[in-house]
Amino acid sequence: MAAEPEDNCISFVEMKFINNTLYFVAENDEDLESDYFGKLEPKLSIIRNLNDQVLFINQGHQAVFEDMPDSDCSDNAPQTVFIIYMYKDSLTRGLAVTISVQCKKMSTLSCKNKTLSFKEMSPPDNIDDEGNDIIFFQRSVPGHDDKIQFESSLYKGYFLACKKENDLFKLILKEKDECGDKSIMFTVQNKN
């Protein structure tokens, strides 16, 4: 009895060594995709840390957390409602997202050089990289049904986190420690 070929498999017809690297040549590579992120529909969201403080963009264009009742969230919607664009990912690593805010102009969160800042830009429709400073992987936290974490696609093992600096609770990028770090956990309340 002959085995039936599976639809999601690639048949290889040849192997080549080039500069000490083994390459496989596919019989038909029409359906193969290069690594990229393709933009899907956005969600309007309010992001909170575990102290129930709301993430917002202050006058200095910094992402900070503050105590804020729901009525103030609505009144300050341009600074408190984030646009989370989801992206189709050619690899399976979690839900690929960008985090933007529309305060006068569109700005998108970047972790370039492991420092968070908002770049004045709209997220592009396609990103032809395996890792990018504006793409984060949104994942649920095991054992916490309503908690989310965001891992940088550019810096594996680095997550968005809340850190107290002086009197401010800031959004930062930090390497995850293995001791149940709660500073990297957030709740995301979708508005649409």
From Swiss-Prot:
Query: What family classification does the UniProt entry report for this protein?
Result: Belongs to the IL-1 family.
> What's noted about post-translational modification?
The pro-IL-18 precursor is processed by CASP1, CASP4 or CASP5 to yield its mature, active form. The pro-IL-18 precursor features autoinhibitory interactions between the propeptide and the post-cleavage-site region, preventing recognition by the IL18R1 receptor. Processing by CASP1, CASP4 or CASP5 induces conformational changes to generate critical receptor-binding sites. The mature form is then secreted and released in the extracellular milieu by passing through the gasdermin-D (GSDMD) pore. In contrast, cleavage by CASP3 inactivates IL18.
Q: How does it assemble?
A: Forms a ternary complex with ligand-binding receptor subunit IL18R1 and signaling receptor subunit IL18RAP at the plasma membrane. Mature IL18 first binds to IL18R1 forming a low affinity binary complex, which then interacts with IL18RAP to form a high affinity ternary complex that signals inside the cell. Interacts with cargo receptor TMED10; the interaction mediates the translocation from the cytoplasm into the ERGIC (endoplasmic reticulum-Golgi intermediate compartment) and thereby secretion.
Arranged from A to Z, the UniProt key words for this protein are: Cytokine, Cytoplasm, Inflammatory response, Secreted
Which Pfam families has this protein been placed in? IL1
Organism (species): Sus scrofa
- Under the GO molecular function aspect, what terms does this record hold? cytokine activity; interleukin-18 receptor binding
Name the major location. Answer: cytoplasm
Keyword Nucleus found: no
Output this protein's name. Interleukin-18
Gene3D superfamilies in the record: 2.80.10.50
Q: Where is this site: Cleavage?
A: 35-36, 70-71
Explain the purpose of this protein: Pro-inflammatory cytokine primarily involved in epithelial barrier repair, polarized T-helper 1 (Th1) cell and natural killer (NK) cell immune responses. Upon binding to IL18R1 and IL18RAP, forms a signaling ternary complex which activates NF-kappa-B, triggering synthesis of inflammatory mediators. Synergizes with IL12/interleukin-12 to induce IFNG synthesis from T-helper 1 (Th1) cells and natural killer (NK) cells.
